[in-house]
């Protein structure tokens, strides 16, 4: 597999690749992941790993400059997978799919997972990056034996735009252990005394809407913005400027392990105010911990939560503010959604089922 940065929690693609690979290895398959070289936000201890739960990890040459890291690592991963002794090459995301022709030319079966229409993302809306990702999408259509999509909306897009049939196989989620607040107390956080956003710090996730809305509501609860900044430091600084003057707002930086478990386990509400999603893994995770979720009305979120969450109008700070205030004032509504969330989402999105569906595509002639 390639397209991920590393087997880490840096983003949704990375989590998906790790969950798929772990289960494929347990089924007796030999799995290799071609990862970017260099350091990442998960910590120094992850940089030297050559194997993870039986998954072979190989680093490929990566030009560590904005706009070039993904292109260079995907090219060399495509090259190594083309010449390697592999039956199937599974590529993740539209940009890396640009190089789907490489393993295909050398007789490999090629599977591409479209994690979202990446050319719609703020940082790829123009210039070389936009053209490269658009061509990656076209190359996936042309060279991939099978294409996996994570939402019905993207499935419709490929059918309407290219008359290409795809396979709808969404992401999955594990049933977690809910834990007590301990380490998060260093930020003044306790059970149900904060609203949580946890995910990448990028404009399309809409954290700026959340901060603007939160600053207008009357509550003693805190707002926690948890997530790492990779190549979006400018946006991260903008969020901190927006939050200035409101000491209820807490920025934790990148979190994982016990800290992540505690944040999900003890939140009053989890909020995902995205303008754009492929399939929001953080939303699945939040619901799996039994959270009441407040999400934008984009199809990728609405399809996931159905009637088991609170929904506001995308990009609408006023509506988000009203929904936040109402939730803070009506704990009974929040509690009712909490008790439904975990069983609902874990039954709907099961990783073992998803891996089995993916393996069936690997075996199709």
Language-model segments: what does each one mean?
Residues 15, 193, 197, 202-216:
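A conserved mid-protein helix/loop that constitutes part of the nucleotide-sugar donor-binding site
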Residues 37-39, 173, 198, 222-237, ...:
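Glycosyltransferase donor-sugar binding loop
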Residues 79-82, 105, 129-147:
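Membrane-proximal helix-turn-helix segments that form the acceptor-binding/catalytic region
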Residues 236-258:
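Nucleotide-activated donor-binding/catalytic signature segment of Leloir-type glycosyltransferases, i.e.
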Residues 254-255, 262-267:
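Short alpha-helical donor nucleotide-sugar binding micro-motif in glycosyltransferases
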Residues 275:
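Aromatic "clamp/platform" in nucleotide-sugar-dependent glycosyltransferases that forms part
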Residues 292-295:
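Short hydrophobic beta-strand element within catalytic cores of glycosyltransferases
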Residues 310-318, 326-332:
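Conserved acidic donor-binding segment of nucleotide-sugar-dependent glycosyltransferases
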């Amino acid at each position: 597999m390639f397209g991920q940065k590393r087997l880490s929690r840096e983003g949704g693609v990375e989590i998906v690749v790790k969950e798929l690979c772990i289960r494929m290895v347990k089924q007796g398959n030999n799995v290799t992941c071609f990862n970017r070289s260099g350091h990442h936000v998960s910590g120094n201890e992850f940089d030297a790993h050559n194997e993870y739960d039986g998954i072979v990890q190989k680093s490929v040459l990566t030009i560590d400059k904005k706009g070039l890291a993904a292109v260079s690592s995907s090219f060399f991963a495509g090259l190594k997978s083309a010449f390697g002794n592999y039956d199937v090459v599974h590529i993740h995301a539209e940009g890396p799919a640009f190089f789907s022709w490489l393993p295909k030319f050398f007789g490999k079966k090629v599977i591409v997972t479209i994690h979202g229409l990446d050319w719609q993302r703020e940082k790829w809306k123009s210039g070389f990056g936009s053209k490269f990702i658009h061509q990656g999408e076209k190359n996936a259509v042309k060279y991939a034996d099978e294409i996996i999509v994570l939402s019905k909306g993207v499935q419709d897009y490929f059918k309407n735009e290219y008359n290409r049939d795809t396979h709808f196989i969404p992401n999955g989620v594990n049933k977690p252990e809910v834990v007590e607040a301990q380490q998060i107390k260093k930020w003044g956080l306790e059970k149900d005394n904060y609203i949580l956003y946890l995910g990448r710090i990028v404009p399309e996730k809409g954290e700026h809407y959340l901060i603007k809305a939160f600053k207008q509501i009357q509550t003693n609860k805190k707002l926690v913005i948890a997530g790492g900044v990779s190549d979006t430091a400018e946006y991260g600084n903008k969020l901190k400027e927006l939050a200035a003057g409101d000491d209820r707002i807490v920025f934790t930086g990148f979190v994982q392990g016990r800290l992540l478990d505690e944040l999900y386990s003890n939140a009053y509400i989890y909020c995902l105010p995205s303008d754009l999603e492929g399939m929001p893994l953080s939303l699945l995770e939040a619901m799996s911990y039994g959270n009441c979720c407040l999400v934008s009305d984009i199809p990728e979120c609405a399809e996931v939560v159905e009637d088991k969450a609170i929904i506001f109008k995308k990009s609408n700070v006023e509506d988000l503010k009203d929904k936040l205030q109402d939730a803070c004032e009506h704990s009974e509504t929040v509690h009712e959604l909490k008790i439904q969330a975990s069983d609902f989402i874990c039954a709907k999105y099961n990783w073992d089922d998803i891996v089995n569906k993916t393996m069936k595509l690997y075996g199709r002639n």
